[in-house]
Amino acid sequence: MQIKEQLRQLKPYQPGKPIEEVKMEYGLEKVVKLASNENPFGCSQAAKDALHQEIEQLALYPDGYSAALRTRLSEHLQVSESSIIFGNGSDELVQIICRSLLNDQANTITAAPTFPQYRHNAVIEGAEVREVPLRSDGAHDLDRMLEAIDGETKIIWVCNPNNPTGTYTSEQELIAFLNRVPEHILVVLDEAYYEYVTAEDYPESIPLLKQYPNVMILRTFSKAYGLAALRVGYGIADEALIRQIEPAREPFNTSRIGQASALAALDDQTFIQECVEKNKAGLKQYYDFAETHGLTCYPSQTNFVLIDFNRPADELFQALLEKGYIVRSGQALGFPTALRITVGTKEQNEEILTILAEIL
């Protein structure tokens, strides 16, 4: 068999060690995972209740149109139902977009470092990936991204807030950027951490869709909504664009349980606000720690923080792992002396920071 040449350039996704495996390997009774930016407070009770109500329907295929969730989400976002596309997590939407727009004659532009699935899926389609280094403040260098555009550019990815730095592009910066991007190029605003943002000058992106039909917004129920296991993401864009890329979407790509739980979670905004407030307090714990120990820390608009410890990240990762804390080493993220740490509960944050202080 002849596998695509570009697949030989890629490695399959390597998930972190399962919690149970870490317990067995290091003889631990408790392991805390602060590596994947999951919600440490779980999900809304309403989402759990909705999940249980769907259990009797598991023999039936889900609604391929996600009609009930689509209607409620369109009301929540104040957009038309036909301007929404659902994905098996927003990861699948990245795949759908690349499959729809890219080929071996095209190129796509991303920041570096940023969410790696943009590059991964573009390479599979045979496209050239043009990576533009982040600015010194960890944010996208939009001017240099504009300079990278040519006649074969099809997609520009703006991860906002950016993963792994947690930094963001302001509304003023974004609008100035969009005004200079040719209309035939799709600009994808990946807002996976949208609900956690507190910056006053963060873009209100949905109203921009009327002026910029070449913009698509990606969001997810995996982060603040705490439904990572159920894989429900969505995209918002001009109705014509959604119609054009819908054929690349699998027919039943979101489950009955996922749709029902996401709908219920959407209606519990009190839970989201509580999580956002706890996250703000948690971020302050990390900021204070970084200041006390003279460490560099990017201000974050997400539920994670990237701290530069000025020593090999893999060594710190291993030291924490042996103590029962799983974080993300910056080695594979483009920051070889930093750790990306998910903001946990107050107690989890205190525990890991105590361990880090001892190591330092």
From Swiss-Prot:
InterPro entries: Aminotrans_II_pyridoxalP_BS, Aminotransferase_I/II_large, HisP_aminotrans, HistidinolP_aminotransfase, PyrdxlP-dep_Trfase, PyrdxlP-dep_Trfase_major, PyrdxlP-dep_Trfase_small. Pathway: Amino-acid biosynthesis; L-histidine biosynthesis; L-histidine from 5-phospho-alpha-D-ribose 1-diphosphate: step 7/9. Its cofactor is pyridoxal 5'-phosphate. It catalyses: L-histidinol phosphate + 2-oxoglutarate = 3-(imidazol-4-yl)-2-oxopropyl phosphate + L-glutamate. GO terms for molecular function: histidinol-phosphate transaminase activity; pyridoxal phosphate binding. Homodimer. It comes from the Bacteria. GO terms for biological process: L-histidine biosynthetic process. Its EC number is 2.6.1.9. The modification N6-(pyridoxal phosphate)lysine is found at residue 223. This is Histidinol-phosphate aminotransferase. Keywords: Amino-acid biosynthesis, Aminotransferase, Histidine biosynthesis, Pyridoxal phosphate, Transferase. It comes from Bacillus velezensis (strain DSM 23117 / BGSC 10A6 / LMG 26770 / FZB42) (Bacillus amyloliquefaciens subsp. plantarum). It is an enzyme of class 2 (transferase). Belongs to the class-II pyridoxal-phosphate-dependent aminotransferase family. Histidinol-phosphate aminotransferase subfamily. NCBIfam families: hisC.
